[in-house]
Amino acid sequence: MTRHHQDRFLTTHVGSLPRSQTVVDQIFSLERGEPVDEAIFDQVMAEAVDEVVRRQVVAGIDIVSDGEMSKISYATYIKDRYTGFDGDSPRRTPADLLEYPGFMNRASSGGGTPTYRRPCCVGPIAVKDERPLHNDIKRVKDAAKKHGAKQVFMNAASPGVVSLFQPNQHYANDDAYLEALAHALRHEYHAIVDAGLILQIDSPDLGLGRHMMYKDLEDDVYLSRIEKHVEALNFALVAIPADRVRMHVCWGNYEGPHHKDVPLATILPTVLKAKPQGLLFETSNPRHAHEWETFAEMKSDIPEDKILIPGVLDSTTNFIEHPRLVAQRIQKFAEIVGKD
């Protein structure tokens, strides 16, 4: 999946990066259905991707991305690319925030919650418009070539995370919905890999789903559901080499109590069944920083070909971690599976 380096660990991130107000204005105009000049939109996005790739290269990031500049959200962007999605759906409140309503109200009133639509699945899912995907691919490849980035990844939603944020109102049951999503998303996955990019599957449904979509289920029922999510993903990836894919699992990138997060030990056996060779996961926030121990305890269960990509910086704090702390976090995992 990635180059191995003799002298140091390669660096990357999980995708979404800050956007300029100009980019935000263009994206939300499109989201609201307002007239958008296609040429201006393309120019704004191309310039934004060029700049964000340049900054990643300057910062020393080895495996860069387009920062998801053109996407309204890492999961709901599919409504612009596939048929079958329309309307809006009620927001599901995470279980941890339900127990702290005062905090939840402050967070929502302070502008910390998204205002974009989360449509429902209301009809058959099929490819509607390939242009946004191919435009994204072209922009990031052009920027990578210009600035000398050697490796590039591109994000794509997993079938499970689409089902998490866009409820099914069309298919007979959740299994049928996942199957339809896997068939449709396979097209996007192949296009990204065929373009020479590393495919990153965003699958927070495996973690976040526990205290959001499946918060009322018993653990065994929840685990059986995410097993289905992994099966759907593996079906979509059946013809793609594992070493061209990595998967991002998290418990929700928001500042909150997170005391309802499912322990990594509970989901790791299921997560490790997913085909992607690379596994990106949280390991630097107060709720999950201790879970390097889980990998140590389950070392024998980690497939030999898996590449662990721990998140050694926390994106929900304003603290700038000391380099020695970051080094310690890396060392803990290197001691478990080796630096290679």
List each language-model region with its residue ranges:
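Domain-level signal for soluble alpha/beta catalytic cores
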Residues: 1-340
